[in-house]
């Protein structure tokens, strides 16, 4: 039947023929079950449904005095697909993905901070009150800024994306500065009570730079000596050339006896 294989659909007919031909002694026990509930014979594959991104906003509509919750549907561009890509699974998108991409594009070094990747249900952010950025039991990170911005967009009337981003970033910078000050004060208090710390990151960097400079200086000295030796091989050693010049000057000054 061309490129279609109907062997699985005709398993009952095959079993009946084998039993009639004597290849199997007794019919299989599932023979009547397959007769009552036959396999599906749908050969047409349905295309996966395309879902749209729905966003919740609080807006003051014209003619109303109080803000209302409005659900907006983001218009999705309909792009022609190739036949080979028509039945691919639908891409799952959330509004947080765009906010997360924008934040980490502006703050790439936040990805270098250690993070806790253990989650219980994958919805840990729903267990916090994002009316404030700092949460008890959770470290301050980029995900906090994303959830705080999303909360502002969903609950503050007439809030724009850029304004929510500015508010969340301002709170984030203030808390990061507070953490830095607390860290410095704790280090100063520990040093005042006799604690000793190793070299700082700046001191470690300077030491590595000094080691690299000394290594380069030794290499440059050796290269200079090799270059001098190559030059002397063609023109003679500088000491020999100076001695020859002195002999020539003496010969010119002292008259040769006749």
Curated annotation (Swiss-Prot):
One of its GO terms (cellular component) is mitochondrial small ribosomal subunit. GO terms for molecular function: structural constituent of ribosome. The keyword Ribonucleoprotein applies. Transmembrane segments: none annotated. Keywords: Mitochondrion, Ribonucleoprotein, Ribosomal protein. InterPro entries: Ribosomal_mS23_fun. The keyword Cell inner membrane does not apply. Pfam families: MRP-S25. Its main location: mitochondrion. It is found in: Mitochondrion. Belongs to the mitochondrion-specific ribosomal protein mS23 family. Component of the mitochondrial small ribosomal subunit. This is Small ribosomal subunit protein mS23. It comes from Aspergillus fumigatus (strain CBS 144.89 / FGSC A1163 / CEA10). The lineage of its organism: Eukaryota, Fungi, Dikarya, Ascomycota, Pezizomycotina.
């Amino acid at each position: 039947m061309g490129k279609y294989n109907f062997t699985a659909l005709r398993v009952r007919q095959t079993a009946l023929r084998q039993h009639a031909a004597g290849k199997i002694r007794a019919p299989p026990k599932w023979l009547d079950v397959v007769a009552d509930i036959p396999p599906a014979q749908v050969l047409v594959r349905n295309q996966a449904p395309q879902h749209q991104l729905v966003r919740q906003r609080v807006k003051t509509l014209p003619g109303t005095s109080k803000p209302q919750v409005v659900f907006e549907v983001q218009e999705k561009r309909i792009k022609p697909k190739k036949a080979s890509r028509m039945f691919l699974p639908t891409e799952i998108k959330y509004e947080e993905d765009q906010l997360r991409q924008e934040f980490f594009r502006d703050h790439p070094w936040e990805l270098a901070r250690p993070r806790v990747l253990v989650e219980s249900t994958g919805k840990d952010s729903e267990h916090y009150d994002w009316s404030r950025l700092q949460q008890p039991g959770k470290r301050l990170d980029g995900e906090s800024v994303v959830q705080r911005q999303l909360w502002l967009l969903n609950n503050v009337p007439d809030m724009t994306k850029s304004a929510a981003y500015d508010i969340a970033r301002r709170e984030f910078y203030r808390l990061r500065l507070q953490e830095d000050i607390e860290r410095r004060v704790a280090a100063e208090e520990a040093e005042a009570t006799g604690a000793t710390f190793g070299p700082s990151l700046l001191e470690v960097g300077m030491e590595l730079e000094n080691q690299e400079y000394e290594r380069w200086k030794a290499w440059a000295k050796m290269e200079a000596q090799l270059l001098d030796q190559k030059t002397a091989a063609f023109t003679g050693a500088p000491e020999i050339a100076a001695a020859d010049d002195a002999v020539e000057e003496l010969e010119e000054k002292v008259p040769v006896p006749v």
